[in-house]
């Protein structure tokens, strides 16, 4: 297949991030300069974001059989780039106190972002697998970046071994699907899997194994066991990337697969997904109740949020509102998670050993960092789905599509899960306003709001509030991604 200039324009974000990887690699080889390499990474990610405007002008097109660039791909590419940009921004002050090599951190984040962009554009099971591996392999190193801390090293080893096992399930599942259908393209799968073929045992086994592999990457029950330990052990900026860019990119490609290939038409697969969604919502929220570590709490919380999103995915066959629900929910989840993990990153910067992730570290934060406490409160309220926040809009959409698809027991699970979640989110928020302990623990720098990370956190809080009151602009952007499918 010939690559035309139009194709190159469509691939601009991928090409720009790839070029940034090469430039940063050469810069590290030439001379180690933390500020220079951080700046190059941020410039590259910003340039990739700006290039989305030119991609939009080029229109929807297939670029090789592996990728399709359209409104859907642009939306998820934008979300991945925003998460990657925030990760680099939070990482800079954290790395200032880190005595080992700092520069490779940005290189690994950029390579993982490259995998996320590939997933957003994937239109083939081969590009899906390549994208997942490209996003996973750098994360093995990022999770263990604070390798002198036993907890970080343990988390990295655990994530590496379990991720390798999940990838083998995913790859074997793809092989079974190919053996039955004769093609790996999403569109071809949609054409070849009609007339009751989805009930073939070999095909069901293949999709079942793919669900195991993808369920691990998305931290869905019962493939979630790595999540709390890895979130806790990873440096705070890495937990930010794990919770946002990684999950958004993988969920986006799963959604595209469901749109083109009628996987959800199989009653057996729908039942399995419904059980996974129900278990993820209830178990994730129940396990978060007893947590006193904020990163572990947010890890269990992410399990329940992916369960909510799975409800919209199961309801996908009932209409376009499910696509809208996923887009709005993921945007709300992105900004809320960036704000929450951003506060943890600011409190943990510069690197001084373990992160400030104990709930005790945030007790009475309001009395000496009032704006930071207010930001954390807004994020907790949004994650809980309280009205006047973007999290509420996303959760309302999920409930609406659940009702529309008559998924009554899953709607009930969303309501019960949200009620349980309200308790532990408010527990974090209330602790911020209690009397500060006599011997205060870690604290954010006094001028945190003037740092790049502080600005990102403040913008995230502002977006959560503004889009929670007036979500029409976000809904319009999400709808623009839909007609180009």
From Swiss-Prot:
Domain of life (superkingdom): Bacteria
One record GO biological process: ATP synthesis coupled electron transport
Enzyme nomenclature, EC number: 7.1.1.-
Topology in the lipid bilayer: Multi-pass membrane protein
Top enzyme class: translocase
Compartments, as annotated in UniProt: Cell inner membrane
InterPro entries the UniProt entry points to: NADH-Q_OxRdtase_suN/2 (IPR010096), ND/Mrp_TM (IPR001750)
Reaction catalysis annotation: a quinone + NADH + 5 H(+)(in) = a quinol + NAD(+) + 4 H(+)(out)
GO molecular function term, any single one: quinone binding
CC terms in the record's Gene Ontology section: plasma membrane
Keywords: Cell inner membrane, Cell membrane, Membrane, NAD, Quinone, Translocase, Transmembrane, Transmembrane helix, Transport, Ubiquinone
Cross-referenced Pfam families: Proton_antipo_M (PF00361)
TM region(s), chain numbering: 8-28, 35-55, 71-91, 105-125, 127-147, 159-179, 203-223, 235-255, 271-291, 297-317, 326-346, 373-393, 408-430, 450-470
Stated role: NDH-1 shuttles electrons from NADH, via FMN and iron-sulfur (Fe-S) centers, to quinones in the respiratory chain. The immediate electron acceptor for the enzyme in this species is believed to be ubiquinone. Couples the redox reaction to proton translocation (for every two electrons transferred, four hydrogen ions are translocated across the cytoplasmic membrane), and thus conserves the redox energy in a proton gradient.
Subunit structure comment from the entry: NDH-1 is composed of 13 different subunits. Subunits NuoA, H, J, K, L, M, N constitute the membrane sector of the complex.
Family: Belongs to the complex I subunit 2 family.
Protein name per UniProt: NADH-quinone oxidoreductase subunit N
Biological source species: Shigella boydii serotype 4 (strain Sb227)
